[in-house]
Amino acid sequence: MTSKQRGRPRSFDRPTALEQATMAFWEHGYETTSVSDLTRVMGISAPSLYAAFGDKKTLFEEVVEEYARSYGAFGGRAFAEEPTARSAIGRMLREAAVEYTDPAHPRGCLMISAAINCSTPEVEEDLRTRRNANISAFEARIRRDVESGELPADTDAHALARFSGAVLQGMSQQARDGAGRPELEALAETAMLAWPVTGTRAGRGSVSPAGPGISPETPAGRGA
């Protein structure tokens, strides 16, 4: 007599399943994306999800890490490749206009939109910490440029960093509300006009975000 096989784990491609989970959280947010939603879009059973990723919160944590390494990595690249805060943040905002409106994935930034109406304190706190870490990186780079003379001595680094973070977060919400790439690019250019004129170094008098720009204090690994 042959025994019937039971409980055999379903075979699936883990990276593909993780990508599908990313799309679900990005589109609908953490709170409103249920485990049943996740198993449906990932094409796996609930036991397979728990075995491979843990619970919903640990899956989301992995999604956020992967997002920071992929879709959200443009901010870190700008800070790693540009010589000044002005050009790094200007580039980051321009690239956000492209990334946030890319039709290949949900609009806006996952780390911003996924936190809306989130009632899970640990998730909300983690996303807030990541966003604030980005602003701290902006401020550190701005302060370096003030010290080097790239920006005027009376530049309010804290306020300018907060302003830049607010613009980035606002661009994400604008994209979610239907703003197109040209509108967000115009917003980015306008935001850079608020920066003080360049100090004693190269690019004197320029308010364009297209100049040189960045530093080791980068938002890389936290996403933009």
Predicted regions and their residues:
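Amphipathic C-terminal alpha-helical segment
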Residues: 99, 144, 164-182, 193-203
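Short, basic, alpha-helical segments at the C-terminal edge of helix-turn-helix-like DNA-binding modules
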Residues: 65-71
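Short coil/turn segments at alpha/beta junctions that flank glycine-rich nucleotide-binding fingerprints
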Residues: 28-31, 82, 148
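Amphipathic alpha-helical packing segments from all-alpha helical-bundle domains
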Residues: 72, 90, 121-148, 158-159
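Helix-turn-helix
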Residues: 2, 16, 20, 24-58, ...
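Hydrophobic alpha-helical connector segments
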Residues: 62, 76-107, 157-164
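Hydrophobic alpha-helical segments that form the core
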Residues: 107-117, 155-174, 186-194
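N-terminal intrinsically disordered/low-complexity leader segments
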Residues: 1-12, 155, 199-224
